[in-house]
Amino acid sequence: MEGSVTPQPAGGPFTIDITCFDGQGNWSSIQLQDILFGDVWLCSGQSNMAMAVSQALNGTAELAASVNYPNVRVLSVKAEVSYTPYYDLNSTASLYHPWAKPDPDSLGVNAVENYTYFSAVCWFYGRDLYDTYKVPMGMISTNWGSTPIQPWSSPDVFNSCVENATKADVTKSRCASETEKEFEYKPYFKNDTVLWNAMIHPFVNMTIKGAIWYQGESNTFLGTDTYSCFFQAMISDWRQKWYAGSSQQTNPLFPFGFVQISTSWVPQFGVINNYPVIRWHQTNDVGYVPNAGMPNVFMAVALDLSDPESPYGAIHPRYKQDVAARLVQAARVVAYQEKGVIYQGPFPTKFNVDSQEETIDVQYNNKGSGPIRLVGPLNNTFEVCCSNYTECQENDTWIDTTVTALTGLYSIRMNYTCEDLDAVAIRYLWSDYPCTFKNCPVYNQDGFLPAPPFWLPLDYSVSIGNSAVKFGGFKFLICFCHVFLFACFYFPLGRY
């Protein structure tokens, strides 16, 4: 059963009586109790999003405190695969827990396995949004560890990013029926599109405020080169599918937040070189969001939240509260249109090179970050490419530089030595584990937001503003009543 009601002010709880006529002279009714009107956010990704509240720092205390947020509601989805799209979750067996008020039970205190029940990042994000706006929040946690981006992408994404997209998995996802599947192999959780079908598609007819995403580690060794295309195309595709599936009630440019991946190693294990590459690809090879190719997208930089002592492995840092806080800071501008909020880490806008003195001045002046502050070690974090060419070549040498001074509110100076070569490019934090906990070199003035990594030519110049933050003017309430799902949330005018 599916229906909609007229817009209502955010709030609750309410009781809603629904009466239905089946067209054959039969009437039935259902009463929905304890209903809230507010914002729905979908949270997805791999194990760092799946990491449960109990696994986060101070998890036991966080679980106990969750009962203080009855106006945040949570839905926990089990891991499931399918070659064909689901239009609803198959049964209550598809859920760790149906829609519920947060408490230790609904957030997974009794979970037998880690990375199940409710996402820590999702919970802290929804909780902090509620603390900020006092608007009810509905949070959906649908994740699977060790997954690349491809299983979360529909066939249309592959059509955008894979030349002559005729992969067997994609063809099967698009064309095969469940009857045909009875005689074939069962889908594997890393097969193309199978998680889109089973764990995302069931929600596209539910109106949402936005989505947050924490994924990318698995693509450091699988499909690294195509990640930029896949991520951008997946965001666009999800937006199109939700806009159509919710009868044009969801913003066609709904806010999409992501976590730029953290670290994966401790020193004795070496470096996974593709971590900085994936971080770069997550921004569409621009370095910051929102940007022209990723409008209404925001991010939390996490490479300075390393946790080598994590009992879950260094690839799974426990500092999920910090991740969520940074996401919320960016969402305040991109999703909720606040003005005057510092929501981006410092990003270069221009480089001034003095080849005689061998100094480089890095200018930071992006409107979203404000003045800068130097915090951590000032050597071995900025590198310069020395070359005989005007562009850095694959075999050219990268040399470490040393930051020597903060030369103004928005600029720093560093020394370099290229001998008889020219300095043509510069990169920052271009390694798996570039700094210890909250101890990278450059932050915004209050030390809350780190500068993201970059790889840029030294003739780079850009003006960074909020031009890629786009807002809609929708005003609606949408209320879906499924056999196994219920969510009813209100989106007032201008909340995009």
What are the language-model segments listed below?
Residues 1-464:
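Cell-envelope and extracellular/periplasmic
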Residues 299-301, 472-478, 492:
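Poly-acidic low-complexity segments
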Residues 461-479:
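C-terminal GPI-anchoring signal of eukaryotic secretory precursors
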Residues 488-496:
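C-terminal membrane-anchoring or membrane-association module
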